[in-house]
């Protein structure tokens, strides 16, 4: 069978398989527990920091090398900063810039990279390259979606993927926070 990946889930292939977490089961279990008082903003911030550090550490301490996407925004900058804090060597981060200054955040990304001491790879996508990527989208994505970031994400994935099998990103941070 072929199914969509559950939101918030991950897949690890093992002989015989094992499902270690299910959102529905977790929700039902949580509903059975007595309500706890909400943490303060400071406590919630501290908890989030710990969870993010653990998540990044788990991915960085894999047997394969990883890099990161760096847009210069808050989310990817935070991920890259946490990666660099956990690494003895400069990590590698990739940015896709644009010729249109209204859409280009590569200056911010370069400043973040310099400040953190990461090895920064900056690639400028021109309109020809954008059109080439656009024509390939039906073969790349398993279903259509309308997100302007899919072109630079695809390009960054290909650039990073040529050197690192794992990429960490800040995607989803805006929606979460």
Language-model features: locations:
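N-terminal segments that mediate ammonia production and transfer
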Residues: 1-39
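ATP-dependent adenylate-handling active sites, centered on carboxylate activation for C-N bond formation
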Residues: 26-177
């Amino acid at each position: 069978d072929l199914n969509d990946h559950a939101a918030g889930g991950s897949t690890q292939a093992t002989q015989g398989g094992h499902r270690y977490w299910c959102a529905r089961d977790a929700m039902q279990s949580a509903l059975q527990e007595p309500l706890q008082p909400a943490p303060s903003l400071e406590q919630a911030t501290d908890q989030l920091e710990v969870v993010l550090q653990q998540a990044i550490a788990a991915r960085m301490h894999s047997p394969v090398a990883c890099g990161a996407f760096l847009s210069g925004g808050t989310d990817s900058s935070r991920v890259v900063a946490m990666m660099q804090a956990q690494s003895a060597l400069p990590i590698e981060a990739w940015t896709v810039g644009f010729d249109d200054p209204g859409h280009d955040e590569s200056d911010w990304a370069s400043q973040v990279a310099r400040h953190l001491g990461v090895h920064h790879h900056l690639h400028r996508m021109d309109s020809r390259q954008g059109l080439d990527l656009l024509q390939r989208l039906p073969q790349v994505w398993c279903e259509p979606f309308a997100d302007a970031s899919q072109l630079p994400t695809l390009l960054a994935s290909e650039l990073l993927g040529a050197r690192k099998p794992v990429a960490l990103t800040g995607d989803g941070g805006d929606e979460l926070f």
